[in-house]
């Protein structure tokens, strides 16, 4: 029996003009976009559509923008009937909306706060991330341990696919790894355009503030399992999910294990909902046999709704 998982991208997928094609062209998507504009304390639609002030790349804006785009696409799709859902990092919040763990309005407030706390904890230039290509997890972990000291750390942060491990930590060590990468055996090390050391233990400084903030919202048991980044398991219990979303701040994203867990459950079709095809590209490198569908635009939505 064929099973389907809907999956959602995280930071890095944003681009100017995102979701503009949906606005006023699809009632369900427009409702989500309008709701985001009413709920948030900044002009999210201007930031997404034109970004005249150049603020889309700031994490406190990127996070609600991506959640809003994925949720608008999701609302516009008919006859999805997924068996599971999974998101990469920030994308996990879109999964929570999809599985009705959080309302969209609550989720968009939470990711706005998540971004603000991250930005406040690490002013630009303190922490960073980089993608290490061509090495396995054990080797990357070993390199990180050899570079880290008592006052500066670098750690594996996203275990994306074979030969692609993202590391996170103090910018000085990230820069050192970028410089030394090839001599350490990597094909290359690419710095990422992010403003903080996400998914590293450095993020524990915001754990308490974030945990107390998300406790004020209503969390519900998931309508279908959410495969969580921190443990690569499908969860439906609201308390387990909420606890894992706090741990997610400072824990590695277990994307390879999560994808393999889904395939073990019988999933043979992954539908990526949101800008870009980053996750589809990663999954191809994990398993070439699964079916991949990308829903990024109004045209993609129409194609799905007409054919399914």
UniProtKB/Swiss-Prot annotation:
Q: Which GO terms describe its cellular component?
A: cytosol
Catalytic activity, EC? 2.3.1.39
Lipid metabolism in keyword set: yes
SMART domains from the UniProt entry: PKS_AT
User: Which Gene Ontology MF annotations are present?
Assistant: [acyl-carrier-protein] S-malonyltransferase activity
Which catalytic residues are annotated?
A: 89, 199
Q: Which family would the database say this protein is a member of?
A: Belongs to the FabD family.
Q: Which PANTHER family match?
A: MALONYL-COA-ACYL CARRIER PROTEIN TRANSACYLASE, MITOCHONDRIAL (PTHR42681:SF1)
What is the designated name of this protein? Answer: Malonyl CoA-acyl carrier protein transacylase
Taxonomic lineage = Bacteria, Bacillati, Bacillota, Bacilli, Bacillales
């Amino acid at each position: 029996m064929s099973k389907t998982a809907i999956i959602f991208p995280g930071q890095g997928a944003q681009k100017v003009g995102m979701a503009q094609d949906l606005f006023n062209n699809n009632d369900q998507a427009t409702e989500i976009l309008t709701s985001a504009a009413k709920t948030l304390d900044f002009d999210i639609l201007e930031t997404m559509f034109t970004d005249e002030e150049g603020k889309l790349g700031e994490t406190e804006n990127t996070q609600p923008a991506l959640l809003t785009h994925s949720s608008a696409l999701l609302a516009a799709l008919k006859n999805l009937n997924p068996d599971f859902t999974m998101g990469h990092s920030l994308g996990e919040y879109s999964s929570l909306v999809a599985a009705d763990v959080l309302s969209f309005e609550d989720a968009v407030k939470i990711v706005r706060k998540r971004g603000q706390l991250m930005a406040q904890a690490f002013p630009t230039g303190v922490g960073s991330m980089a993608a290490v290509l061509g090495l396995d997890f054990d080797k990357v972990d070993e390199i990180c341990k050899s570079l880290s000291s008592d006052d500066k750390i670098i750690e594996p942060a996203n275990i994306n696919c074979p030969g692609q491990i993202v590391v996170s930590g103090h910018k000085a060590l990230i820069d050192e790894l970028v410089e030394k990468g090839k001599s350490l055996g990597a094909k290359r090390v690419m710095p990422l355009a992010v403003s903080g050391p996400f998914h590293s233990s450095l993020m524990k400084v915001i754990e308490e503030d974030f945990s107390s903030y998300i406790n004020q919202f209503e969390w519900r048991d998931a309508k279908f399992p959410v495969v969580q980044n921190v443990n690569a398991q499908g969860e439906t219990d609201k308390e387990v999910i909420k606890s894992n979303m706090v741990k997610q701040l400072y824990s590695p994203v277990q994307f390879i294990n999560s994808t393999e867990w889904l395939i073990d459950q019988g999933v043979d079709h992954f539908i990526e909902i949101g800008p870009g095809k980053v996750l589809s590209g990663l999954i191809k490198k994990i398993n070439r046999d699964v079916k991949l569908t990308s829903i990024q635009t109004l045209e993609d939505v129409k194609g799905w709704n007409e054919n399914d």
